[in-house]
Amino acid sequence: MSTSQSSEQTLNYQWDVCLSNMVVQSGIGLGAGIVSSVLFFRRAAWPVWGGLGFGLGKSYADSNARLRTFHAIPKQLPASSTQKKD
């Protein structure tokens, strides 16, 4: 039996995905900036900020595309512990 999800639950799920992508991708960009700064640029600060900027920009673009497309929303959201399981 399929239960329908409210639009509020769907939007909350999409925002959760976008925020987790932002944390992960900005962390990856920051890490890549730190590594490149230490190895190649004699500990300059600009590669760190550039990597962080690339990570945040990538996550913004992904979130923008995810929130604007209708078919990107999954039909069945993962069940949370507060929902009744049948």
Swiss-Prot record:
InterPro entries assigned to the protein according to its UniProt record, in alphabetical order: Mic10
Transmembrane regions listed in the UniProt entry: 22-41
Gene Ontology CC: MICOS complex; mitochondrial crista junction; mitochondrion
Keywords from the UniProt entry: Membrane, Mitochondrion, Mitochondrion inner membrane, Transmembrane, Transmembrane helix
Mitochondrial intermembrane topological intervals: 42-86
Subcellular location: Mitochondrion inner membrane
Membrane topology type: Single-pass membrane protein
GO biological process: cristae formation
Main location: mitochondrion
PANTHER family xref list: MICOS COMPLEX SUBUNIT MIC10
Annotated family: Belongs to the MICOS complex subunit Mic10 family.
Subunit structure, interactors included: Component of the mitochondrial contact site and cristae organizing system (MICOS) complex.
Role noted for this protein: Component of the MICOS complex, a large protein complex of the mitochondrial inner membrane that plays crucial roles in the maintenance of crista junctions, inner membrane architecture, and formation of contact sites to the outer membrane.
Name by which UniProt lists this protein: MICOS complex subunit mic10
